[in-house]
Amino acid sequence: MPSLQDYHVPYPAAAPGQVRKVIYLPQQNPTVEQQHLRVQIIPGRHENCEDGRLYKLTGSVTEETLQGWGYSYYVVKLGDIYAAHRSSSDPARVTTFVALDENPVIAYNSKLPIVVYVPEGAELRYRVWTDDTSLVQSIQQQPEAPALPQPHLVPVTERQECPHELPRCGAPGEYVTQDCKTSMLSVEEVHRLSSSTPPLIPSAVRGSAHEAHAAPPLHSAELEERVCPVMEHLEVCPQNNGHEGREQPAEEASTLKRRSSSSSSSNPRHHSANEPSPSRPRLSSTEYWPHENSKTKRSPSATHKPRRSTDSAAIEEAGVGAPKKNRSSSSSASSKRKAEDNVYEKTMKNFWNRARSDSPRKASASSKKSGNGSKADP
């Protein structure tokens, strides 16, 4: 621990009735000492406080400067005691430290000691204050904790990898070779077995699963042979008016052919392909479009000959293939319309002629009335 003589500073000796106290501060970073640290001087003395009340001392702390050196020292004067407040203290400790009412705060300087002159029987305490920045730096400067010893790792033996080729056992190999030697059944044998087995009945279905699966499956070629003869006797009707196609026997298809041919020869009606007749029976896929006869075909020149009549518009509206009755009716309707138009024109002409003939008569009548009035006035 350093002494006051180590600093070679001539501090004055203590006056009678006083004691010199010296505080030595630990050395810190100069910037931290100047900006982040402060020292609080707390002088006081021990007093008997039997009532358990807290007290304080009156007095003062004065700062003086050493002449010729410029160093500072402090002189403390203590006065009477007084009760600070009625908060309870430790009743077991009757004699307690009573601090001075004034506790000055000074700068932190580790290069020079803090010299304080206090009265005899007094005690000097101090407190170092710091801010958050210095606290963080002190925490960062603390030595790191020693690393914990790593646990001893026991080496683990590596597992042997399974070989790619496993040893073959005797029994499975024999079973596989025996299975490969069996020859596959031919199509004829499958057909013979399937023909010999009777069809399933409800009693057979209720049997065990072993009996149900006893019959061997049919080959694809055999299935095709069995399905084709059935399809030969059926004809599929085309889909018409949003209804799905239906299968009809060949006999019904032949009867439909006869009916359609007889109806087409007797009643030559013109229908569009998109408007199906409800009374006409459905045609089969082969008879959907009727065959055209070369004898019944007409050349476009024969059917579409230009005509010089004034009713060409009515003929075009009625259609090229319309009968003579329709043409005559259309011509009569057009002639009626023309006659009506002529009558309307005649009536309108007569109306305008009457209106024109009536206008001068009214004017002459008004002039006659005015002349008669003028003569009657004189």
UniProtKB/Swiss-Prot annotation:
InterPro entries: Ecotin_C (IPR027438), Ecotin_sf (IPR036198), Prot_inh_ecotin (IPR005658)
Signal peptide: none
Cross-referenced SUPFAM superfamilies: Ecotin, trypsin inhibitor
Low complexity bias locations: 362-378
One Pfam family of this chain: Ecotin
Compositional bias per record (Basic and acidic residues), positions renumbered to this chain: 337-348
Ranges of Polar residues composition bias in the record: 274-287
Gene Ontology terms for molecular function: serine-type endopeptidase inhibitor activity
Stretches for region Disordered: 191-216, 238-378
Gene3D superfamilies: Ecotin, Ecotin, trypsin inhibitor
Assigned protein family: Belongs to the protease inhibitor I11 (ecotin) family.
This protein's name: Ecotin-like protein 3
Organism encoding this protein: Leishmania infantum
